[in-house]
């Protein structure tokens, strides 16, 4: 299966929708958008092709379902009936678009040197990112949206599974409600886990649908964490960052874990992008 075959397969599976398709050969993406208002989504075909080797038709079914729901929710509709409980935060990479396809700025805030917080209206099986044009219909200010979203993310269940590898404890939050990564904003939850940690606590949001927390008790733990974050990052439908964050008393610090058997786990010169982002972030705070 290559990107051209996947493009054709998806177009065939989505032929029941009133949409148009735009294929970008260079970026290997397929944009699917409504014919009535030009709203749509862009999917990365190369990522889907990579998953197809393991998941076969299951990954195609997942993408078709996701597109079906997203396109349906993009129909023009009133926002006046939206309740405060439907306002949620979502985590995105700092490279994520700052404006809609129509050029309207999204409502977002810087979070770390690697992540940003966007805000969304929860629509049940999908959500819509909030942009400036929606504020009047929602009858909310940007500050109210921030406060509501943080309140709502704290109400989410924080169930997790754990795994022990070579004496290190790993926690996985993977409820698939669209807000797993958003739980990194729940400081009370992170502090609860921190109180249980015997070693250094690391946190990672490799993609939208997972939050990984690690209690690193020996050097092997850093290597395992680096492997986990990269693996999840490459497999996520909405990737965020392959870097981990050190967590201590409510503060998140992006770190770079060096290769196996390297004694140092932090090196401010190892990647210029991280350092540049950190300087910019600290300057703007």
Swiss-Prot record:
Cross-referenced InterPro entries: DUF1444 (IPR010838)
Lineage, opening ranks: Bacteria, Bacillati, Bacillota, Bacilli, Bacillales
Family, similarity comment: Belongs to the UPF0354 family.
Any Pfam family: DUF1444
Taxonomy, superkingdom: Bacteria
Organism annotation: Staphylococcus aureus (strain NCTC 8325 / PS 47)
Protein name: UPF0354 protein SAOUHSC_01859
NCBIfam families assigned: PRK13668.1 (NF010189)
């Amino acid at each position: 299966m290559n990107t051209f075959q996947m493009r054709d397969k998806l177009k065939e599976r989505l032929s029941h929708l009133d949409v148009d398709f735009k294929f970008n050969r260079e970026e290997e993406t397929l944009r699917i958008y409504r014919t009535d208002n030009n709203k749509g989504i862009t999917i990365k075909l190369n990522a889907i092709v990579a998953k197809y080797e393991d998941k076969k038709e299951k990954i195609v079914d997942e993408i078709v379902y996701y597109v079906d729901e997203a396109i349906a929710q993009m129909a023009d509709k009133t926002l006046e009936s939206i309740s405060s409980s439907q306002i949620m935060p979502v985590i995105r990479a700092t490279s994520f678009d700052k404006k809609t396809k129509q050029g309207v700025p999204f409502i977002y805030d810087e979070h770390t040197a690697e992540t940003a917080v966007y805000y969304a209206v929860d629509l049940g099986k999908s959500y819509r990112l909030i942009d400036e044009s929606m504020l009047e219909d929602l009858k909310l200010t940007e500050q109210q949206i921030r406060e509501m979203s943080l309140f709502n993310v704290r109400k989410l269940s924080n169930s997790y599974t754990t795994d022990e590898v070579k004496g290190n404890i790993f926690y996985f939050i993977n409820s698939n409600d669209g807000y797993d990564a958003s739980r990194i904003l729940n400081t009370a939850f992170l502090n609860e886990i921190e109180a249980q940690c015997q070693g250094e606590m690391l946190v990672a949001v490799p993609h939208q649908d997972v939050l990984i927390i690690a209690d690193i008790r020996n050097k092997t733990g850093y290597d395992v964490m680096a492997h986990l974050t990269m693996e999840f990052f490459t497999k996520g439908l909405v990737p965020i960052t392959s870097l981990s964050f050190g967590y201590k008393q409510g503060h998140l610090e992006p770190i770079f874990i060096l290769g196996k058997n390297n004694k140092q786990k932090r090196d401010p010169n190892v990647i210029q992008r991280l350092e540049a982002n950190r300087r910019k972030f600290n300057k703007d705070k």
